[in-house]
Curated annotation (Swiss-Prot):
InterPro entries: ACT-like_dom_sf, ACT_dom, ArAA_hydroxylase, ArAA_hydroxylase_Fe/CU_BS, ArAA_hydroxylase_sf, Aro-AA_hydroxylase_C_sf, Aromatic-AA_hydroxylase_C, Trp_5_mOase. This is Tryptophan 5-hydroxylase. Its cofactor is Fe(2+). One of its GO terms (molecular function) is tryptophan 5-monooxygenase activity. Fe cation binds at H309, H314, E354. It comes from the Eukaryota. It comes from Xenopus laevis (African clawed frog). Homotetramer. Coiled coil: none annotated. It is an enzyme of class 1 (oxidoreductase).
Amino acid sequence: MYSNRKECPRRVKSFDSVNSGLDENQINNEFNKSTYIKIEDNKEYSENVCERGKASVIFSLKNEIGGLVKALKLFQEKHVNLIHIESRKSKRRNSEFEIFVDCDSNREQLNEIFQLLKPHVNVISMSPPENFTVQEDDMESVPWFPKKISDLDKCANRVLMYGSDLDADHPGFKDNVYRKRRKYFADVAMSYKYGDPIPHIEFTEEEIQTWGTVFRELNKLYPTHACREYLKNLPLLSKHCGYREDNIPQLEDVSRFLRERTGFTIRPVAGYLSPRDFLAGLAFRVFHCTQYVRHDSDPLNTPEPDTCHELLGHVPLLAEPSFAQFSQEIGLASLGASDEAVQKLATCYFFTVEFGLCKQEGKLKVYGAGLLSSISELKHSLSGNAKVKPFDPMVTCNQECIITSFQELYFVSESFEEAKEKMREFAKTIQRPFGLKYNPFTQSVDILKDTKSIAMVVRELRHELDIVNDALNKMNKQLGV
């Protein structure tokens, strides 16, 4: 538990509130014995002072005489000045009490005390020194990541395949007209910069027919296969963005719609991005979206994500606040993470956002975009023949992702909220020397690597809580409470 003493002075409790197992005289005697804890100035102490600041430590001792003196002696041995000490009854166990200590220390001293206290206490938490910051050496090992939404210009064009570069087994490989069209879409995406309106596309008759076939066949399955959130948002897209069998929606219209619903925006992309670059976009509520249409020789199948997949699979759920938050949090967890961690996050994304199932009213429903844009696999996933397991990020992150055929296994969540909570816990296992907080006002990420930046977040949270408290008070007055 962190406590910023400078921002929130704490009232000292009397020792009368401490568990009766240690009476007032015993506790006062222990404090009298510990008066030597204050460190006198000396040469050794002065030479070891660096980057000092006020820090707070909370530890819980068992009900035994002498335990407090033993613990406080560790501070003396490490030449740490104690500024303030107080006790309080433990909320965890009646047989224990907690000691709160304000001290003047640097990072190294605090780490040493933490290690020394652990064998002797049951609970321990601490806040770092007020002027603590992550060392630059720790930051140098962190992979580059975008700090603000405009930084996506630096990574959105790092596509793995470009324009007319198609694999030999692609349906359009020998179709020069199709390849030329693909290059056109790629050039449009490569020319796009943050803040630009997405160019209006005049789709060909063949492209509209292909879209219409996919749209018509999938809409036959959605009422029985898609989750309720998808079914709620699809009619809104028809109304506001022109989702129709005879019309391919424009990305600019879709982007404006999403911005009003969940804050997500669309950015055109020329092709496949690396997992790191794609997830980075999600951190800023930006979805990289292709505009090209699959080849008309096989409209019900595509070897790669196309605009049918993006607009019919992803967009309806990006218009759902809870799902949008889930997607963004996966993106935020990826920023500055190691390659191994990013791959695990990408795999979890694949088996949730792309191929996820959920339970609604006792039945399995689909929310994964890869399923919602594939007629054959959408049928298969709920046929009863597909293998299904509960979503667990620690397990899911090791599952093989299959692109050329149906998945061997699908993961089911009770709800988006459950999946989000599990991913939050999983994200805590990712090693980074800093924390991150998304700033929706500047569309940037705040890097939390020192006590000053963390204190600022605390102030913001207090303001938000004041607003909530004020609203509750007004409701209580209206209710006569």
